[in-house]
Amino acid sequence: MPTITSYFGFLLAASTITSALLIGLSKIRLI
């Protein structure tokens, strides 16, 4: 059970970082 929780937590963190990077890149391109 803890393994599944940590796995989902890792996926959540990875998706959050990826979306943040994509938003940052798009903002830089807009400027």
Swiss-Prot record:
Thylakoid among keywords: yes
Summary of subunit composition and partner proteins: The 4 large subunits of the cytochrome b6-f complex are cytochrome b6, subunit IV (17 kDa polypeptide, PetD), cytochrome f and the Rieske protein, while the 4 small subunits are PetG, PetL, PetM and PetN. The complex functions as a dimer.
A Gene Ontology biological process term: photosynthesis
Natural source organism: Chloranthus spicatus (Chulantree)
GO MF: electron transporter, transferring electrons within cytochrome b6/f complex of photosystem II activity
Segments passing through the bilayer: 4-26
Top-level taxonomic group: Eukaryota
Function of the protein: Component of the cytochrome b6-f complex, which mediates electron transfer between photosystem II (PSII) and photosystem I (PSI), cyclic electron flow around PSI, and state transitions. PetL is important for photoautotrophic growth as well as for electron transfer efficiency and stability of the cytochrome b6-f complex.
Chief localization: plastid
Subcellular localization(s) per the UniProt record: Plastid, Chloroplast thylakoid membrane
Family, per entry: Belongs to the PetL family.
Protein name listed in UniProt: Cytochrome b6-f complex subunit 6
Keywords: Chloroplast, Electron transport, Membrane, Photosynthesis, Plastid, Thylakoid, Transmembrane, Transmembrane helix, Transport
Pfam families tied to this protein: PetL (PF05115)
A GO cellular-component term linked to this record: cytochrome b6f complex
Membrane topology: Single-pass membrane protein
